[in-house]
Regions:
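Structured adenosyl-cofactor binding patch, chiefly the S-adenosyl-L-methionine
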Residues: 99-142
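Conserved RecA-like P-loop NTPase ATPase core
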Residues: 5, 55, 91, 124
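S-adenosyl-L-methionine/SAH cofactor-binding core of RNA-modifying enzymes
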Residues: 28-87
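Catalytic beta-strand/loop module used to bind and position nucleotide/cofactor moieties
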Residues: 68-99, 104-115
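Conserved strand-to-helix beginnings and helix N-cap segments that scaffold or border functional pockets
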Residues: 16-20, 66-67, 101, 121
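Short hydrophobic segments within beta-strands
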Residues: 6-8, 36, 89
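Short glycine-rich anion-binding loops that position phosphate/pyrophosphate groups of nucleotides
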Residues: 11, 59-62, 92-95
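N-terminal beta1-alpha1 ligand-phosphate binding loop
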Residues: 1-23
Length: 143
C-alpha cells in the first residue's frame, strides 16, 4: 500500500523530527510511505498523485477510534483501494480550505482539542503504525 502524508509547512523542531524519523522507520514493513511538505495548501493540492484517495485531518472531521481507523479506513483501502495512493493531508495553522474538505473522502479529527499542526503529523504517523499493527493482529494496541 502506498501512503503519502502530505503536510503544509516544514518540520523544524529536532524532537519532532526524531519522532517522525522513528515512525517512518517503523512503518517500512507495512507500507511504502512518503512525506510531502508543501509551502502552502495550493502546493499540497498540486502535488496530489493522480487517482489518490484523500483523507484530510480537520477539526470538523469525525473522531475515530484506533480500531475504526485501522479497519474502516486502512483495511478498506487495502482491500478495495485498487492500488491507488492513500493520502493523509494535514493543513497549516489555519487548517484546510473548502476545496480540500470537499475533495477528501473523509475528514478525520483527533477530537476537539487544538493541536499544533507540526505535532499532528507525528500523531498521524503513530496512528498509521498502530493501525497496521492492529490489522495484522500484532501486539501493541490495547482497547
Amino acid at each position: 500500500m502506498k501512503v503519502v502524508v502530505s503536510v503544509v509547512g516544514r518540520l523544524k523542531e529536532p524532537y519532532l523530527v526524531a519522532a517522525e524519523d522513528e515512525y517512518r522507520k517503523r512503518l517500512r514493513p507495512y507500507c511504502t510511505l512518503a512525506v510531502h511538505e508543501a509551502k502552502d495548501e495550493a502546493g499540497l493540492v498540486a502535488a496530489l498523485p493522480d487517482g489518490a484517495h484523500l483523507y484530510a485531518f480537520d477539526e470538523r472531521g469525525e473522531a475515530l477510534t484506533s480500531q475504526a481507523f485501522a479497519h474502516d479506513l486502512l483495511g478498506h483501502e487495502q482491500q478495495h483501494g485498487g492500488g491507488a495512493p492513500v493520502v493523509f493531508a494535514i493543513g497549516g495553522a489555519d487548517g484546510h480550505s473548502d476545496l480540500v474538505r470537499r475533495r477528501a473522502r473523509k475528514l478525520i479529527s483527533f477530537g476537539r482539542l487544538t493541536i499544533a499542526h507540526r505535532l499532528v503529523r507525528v500523531l498521524v504517523l503513530e496512528q498509521l503504525y498502530r493501525g497496521f499493527k492492529i490489522l495484522r493482529g500484532e501486539p501493541s494496541h490495547r482497547d
